[in-house]
C-alpha cells in the first residue's frame, strides 16, 4: 500500500548514569573514588534510500534508540547506546509535527539527518575530586534523550509529471514510454497511487515520468484523488497534460490548469506540453482541428496514441529537450536554528524569597545523583560559572534570604 504522509514519534536514548564507587582492594592504600562514566544514549537519524518507495514500510509509530549503559566501579565506563537509522524514500520532507518547521528535505541517495540527539552520559564520582573534596559521594545522572513528533511528507523526484483526467490514458502512456507496469483498466480511478517510470532516450540519456491519480473538476476543493497527490509534481521540471482526444479536450485542459493553479499558481509557469492521446479513435482531419485549437491556448500539442505508438517518438524528443533545458524547481529549504543561550533571571516571589530561573543551571541540578549536601561545593562552582551568584548580587539578595532554583531551596550565603 502506497503511503506518502506519516506522523511518527522518535525518541533518542537516555544517557547512562555515572557511578559512585570507591576502590576497595586489599593492600591498596588510598584507593579513592573510581566511579566510571555512563555511556551516551543512542541518537535517531533518517536516511534517504532509493530502494524505499513508500512510507508504508514504517510500520511502527514510535521509534526509540538504545539507552546508554551506566558506569561502574574500577573506572569502567558504560557502553554508548546504539544509534537508530530509519530509512525513508528519496524525496521525503521532514517537519516538526508540533511547530510545522521544515527540518530536512532528503533528496540525495544516502542523505542523512539527525532528528533526535541522544542524552549525554553522566560523569562518575572520580571527576569531582578536588583538594578539599577527596571522597565525593555524588555523580551525574545521564541526560534524557530528545523526543519529538515528526511529520514525513513524500514528494516524488521526477523530471516530468503527467496530469490528466481519470481514464485519459496516463498509465497507458507511462507503460508505452517506459518499462513501468502500472495498473491499467477501462474505468476511472484505476490509478490510486503515483507511479514512476524511466524513459530511455539513448544509452546515456534518460529522464523520469511521474503518473499521479487523475484530477477531476473540484479537486482543489477536495473532490477526487488527484489533489491529494499533486505534491508529487511539485519537484518536476516539466508538466505533461494528457488529454483524451475523444472527450472534450479543450474543456478538459481548461479545467486541469484551473485546478493545478488553485493548488499552486507557480505550477502554471512550469514548462508544459499537451499530449492529445487516443487519436487512433478519430479521423486525421478531426485530430488536426483539435490540435490547432489546443495550440491556441499557448502550449505545444503532440497528437499521440499510447495504444498504437503513434507520435510517441516525437513526444519523447520534445519532453527530453524541455527537461534538458529546464533546471529543477527551487524548493523551500530548511532554515538552520540558532541556539539561544538561556540567561539567568532572579524573580522576587515574597519578602526575602527569590526564585532563580536558569535552564542551564537547572539541568545541572537535575543530574546530581547521590549526596546533595556533599555536592554543595560543586553546585556553588556551577552557580558562579553560570552567573547565578552575580545575578543574585545584582538583584540585591541579602545573606539569609531564601533562594529557590530547580526544586531546591537554600539560604543565601554570599561568597566572600
Swiss-Prot record:
UniProt entry tagged with the keyword Cell division: no
Subcellular location: Cytoplasm
Stretches assigned to the OBG-type G domain: 158-324
Region (Disordered): 25-44, 62-82
Cofactor(s) of this protein: Mg(2+)
Binding residues annotated for GTP, in chain numbering: 164-171, 189-193, 211-214, 277-280, 305-307
Domain (Obg): residue spans on this chain: 1-157
GO cellular component terms attached to this protein's record: cytoplasm
Keywords: Cytoplasm, GTP-binding, Hydrolase, Magnesium, Metal-binding, Nucleotide-binding
Binding residue positions for Mg(2+): 171, 191
Domain of life: Bacteria
Enzyme class: hydrolase
Enzyme Commission number: 3.6.5.-
InterPro entries xrefs: G_OBG, GTP-bd, GTP-bd_Obg/CgtA, GTP-bd_prot_GTP1/OBG_C_sf, GTP1-OBG_CS, GTP1_OBG_dom, GTP1_OBG_dom_sf, OBG_GTPase
Composition bias type Gly residues, residue spans: 32-42
OCT domain ranges (all copies): 336-414
GO molecular function, one term: GTPase activity
GO biological process: ribosome biogenesis
Cell membrane as UniProt keyword: no
Pfam family, one: MMR_HSR1
Function noted in UniProt: An essential GTPase which binds GTP, GDP and possibly (p)ppGpp with moderate affinity, with high nucleotide exchange rates and a fairly low GTP hydrolysis rate. Plays a role in control of the cell cycle, stress response, ribosome biogenesis and in those bacteria that undergo differentiation, in morphogenesis control.
NCBIfam families reported in the protein's UniProt record: Obg_CgtA, Obg_CgtA_exten, PRK12296.1, PRK12297.1, PRK12299.1
Family the UniProt entry places it in: Belongs to the TRAFAC class OBG-HflX-like GTPase superfamily. OBG GTPase family.
Subunit structure: Monomer.
UniProt protein name: GTPase Obg
Organism for this UniProt entry: Thermus thermophilus (strain ATCC BAA-163 / DSM 7039 / HB27)
Amino acid at each position: 500500500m502506497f503511503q506518502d504522509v506519516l506522523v511518527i514519534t522518535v525518541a533518542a536514548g537516555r544517557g547512562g548514569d555515572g557511578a559512585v564507587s570507591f576502590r576497595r582492594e586489599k593492600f591498596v592504600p588510598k584507593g579513592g573514588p573510581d566511579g566510571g562514566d555512563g555511556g551516551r544514549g543512542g541518537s535517531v537519524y533518517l536516511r534517504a534510500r532509493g530502494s524505499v518507495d513508500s512510507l508504508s514500510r514504517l510500520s511502527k509509530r514510535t521509534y526509540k534508540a538504545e539507552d546508554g549503559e551506566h558506569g561502574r566501579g574500577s573506572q569502567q565506563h558504560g557502553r554508548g547506546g546504539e544509534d537508530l537509522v530509519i530509512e525513508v524514500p528519496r524525496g521525503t520532507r521532514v517537519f516538526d509535527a508540533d511547530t510545522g518547521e521544515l527540518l530536512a528535505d532528503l533528496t540525495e541517495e544516502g542523505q542523512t539527518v539527525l532528528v533526535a540527539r541522544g542524552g549525554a552520559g553522566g560523569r562518575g564520582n572520580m571527576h569531582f575530586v578536588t583538594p578539599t573534596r577527596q571522597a565525593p559521594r555524588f555523580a551525574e545522572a545521564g541526560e534524557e534523550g530528545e523526543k519529538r513528533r515528526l511529520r514525513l511528507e513524500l514528494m516524488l523526484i521526477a523530471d516530468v509529471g503527467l496530469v490528466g483526467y481519470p481514464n485519459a490514458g496516463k498509465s497507458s502512456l507511462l507503460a508505452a514510454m517506459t518499462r513501468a507496469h502500472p495498473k491499467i483498466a477501462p474505468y476511472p480511478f484505476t490509478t490510486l497511487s503515483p507511479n514512476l517510470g524511466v524513459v530511455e532516450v539513448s544509452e546515456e540519456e534518460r529522464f523520469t515520468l511521474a503518473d499521479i491519480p487523475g484530477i477531476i473538476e473540484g479537486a482543489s476543493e477536495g473532490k477526487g484523488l488527484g489533489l491529494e497527490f499533486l505534491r508529487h509534481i511539485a519537484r518536476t521540471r516539466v508538466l505533461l497534460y494528457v488529454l483524451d482526444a475523444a472527450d472534450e479536450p479543450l474543456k478538459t485542459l481548461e479545467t486541469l490548469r484551473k485546478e493545478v493553479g488553485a493548488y499552486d499558481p507557480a505550477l502554471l509557469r512550469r514548462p508544459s506540453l499537451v499530449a492529445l492521446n487516443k487519436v487512433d479513435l478519430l479521423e486525421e482531419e478531426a485530430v488536426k482541428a483539435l490540435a490547432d485549437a489546443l495550440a491556441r491556448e499557448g502550449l505545444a500539442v503532440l497528437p499521440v496514441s499510447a495504444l498504437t505508438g503513434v507520435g510517441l517518438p516525437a513526444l519523447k524528443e520534445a519532453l527530453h529537450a524541455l527537461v534538458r533545458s529546464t533546471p529543477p524547481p527551487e524548493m523551500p529549504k530548511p532554515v538552520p536554528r540558532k541556539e539561544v543561550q538561556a540567561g539567568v533571571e532572579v524573580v522576587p516571589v515574597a519578602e526575602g524569597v527569590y526564585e532563580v530561573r536558569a535552564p542551564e543551571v537547572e539541568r545541572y541540578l537535575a543530574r546530581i545523583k547521590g549526596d546533595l549536601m556533599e555536592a554543595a561545593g560543586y553546585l556553588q562552582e556551577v552557580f558562579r560559572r553560570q552567573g547565578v551568584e552575580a545575578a543574585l548580587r545584582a538583584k540585591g539578595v541579602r545573606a539569609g534570604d531564601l533562594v529557590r532554583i530547580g526544586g531546591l531551596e537554600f539560604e543565601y550565603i554570599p561568597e566572600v
